[in-house]
């Protein structure tokens, strides 16, 4: 069985756009041909695809960096460079994607085949055919391709189960799953047998079905990370219905009502109150001698608290009460689905592109880092420099004019820059000239 991994950190880098071309027409009867440099191709984007065949983020445990290809450079005769292929990465249905540095939610993949563009490829640089003017009919200017987006992401998997089995360790959750589905969880008579969630499909004789997850046993303090704790409570978030199993084994040394309240409190104290989910109370392990007496005390305690919800008595060993529990669970799942559909119609976008918050236009800072050294920082300015082809004098002069229009020269003077001082914008260093 593959290792269950439900959290991971990865880095994704989309492809750079291809560089624009500086070229001119050279034809037999056109001795002074105009510009003919084509545009670069778009860089490859990185796209997550929800795959129902995956159950874990294990594929990302040993490979943490993913890079898409760059676009092809522009060509002569005004030909465009070829766009790079997008890089598709399969993730399990139920994967939530966050920006690792900011914690911002980027997207949630909840349907098979749903796509999420997490890093967009850079656009291709323009060739010199775009820069011809009446004054400069033969421009030696072309843009470099735009850098692709580079992000560090945190992936979280929250199982998409209709029903979640919760309760203390060794209350019979795995056994119930094994007798109602084809899932084969590890079962033994000691605590924390289930170390990873198990998922199975319950199919009833009347044709109804629902998915059910056996979640690792909870103990007091789970919502704060005690035991297997908070790392598995997240899997309860997506469930429609909770089956709350309470052991009627008189030999476990615990009061059933206390077990019930402990688990309810942990669900309530989770970051999103899980105790409000619809639940069925299940008295498990009713085949054990003395279980009837413990059940009577449990029902009495619930009634005294004003809780008149039915208690389902089951034994997964003898199958007593299991059929009725599964039928009533299916009915409750249908009720919850109907309620949700009425509250908010389900609309799932097939492909979604996350739009990262753009910096304020032309926002930059100037810092004096040495006696004659200055550093200019600003995401858009640095991108402008990266897209400037510095191999041609026309390109350098165009960049200088744009920096001046954006107020960089004035800002440098205000910081004390004089002729001959070094100024760095990203990796580009130039000499300041007033």
From Swiss-Prot:
CDD domains: Obg
EC number: 3.6.5.-
Keyword Magnesium: yes
Required co-factors: Mg(2+)
UniProt keyword annotations, A-Z: Cytoplasm, GTP-binding, Hydrolase, Magnesium, Metal-binding, Nucleotide-binding
Signal peptide range: none
Tagged with keyword Metal-binding: yes
Domain OBG-type G: 161-334
Recorded GO MF terms: GTP binding; GTPase activity; magnesium ion binding
Entry binding sites for Mg(2+): 174, 194
A biological process from GO: ribosome biogenesis
Subcellular localization, as worded in the UniProt entry: Cytoplasm
Binding of GTP, residues: 167-174, 192-196, 214-217, 284-287, 315-317
All copies of domain OCT, residue ranges: 356-434
Record InterPro entries: G_OBG, GTP-bd, GTP-bd_Obg/CgtA, GTP-bd_prot_GTP1/OBG_C_sf, GTP1-OBG_CS, GTP1_OBG_dom, GTP1_OBG_dom_sf, OBG_GTPase
Domain Obg: 2-160
HAMAP family, per the entry: GTPase_Obg
Subunit field text: Monomer.
Function summary: An essential GTPase which binds GTP, GDP and possibly (p)ppGpp with moderate affinity, with high nucleotide exchange rates and a fairly low GTP hydrolysis rate. Plays a role in control of the cell cycle, stress response, ribosome biogenesis and in those bacteria that undergo differentiation, in morphogenesis control.
Family membership noted in the UniProt record: Belongs to the TRAFAC class OBG-HflX-like GTPase superfamily. OBG GTPase family.
UniProt-recorded name of the protein: GTPase Obg
Species in which this protein is naturally found: Lactobacillus helveticus (strain DPC 4571)
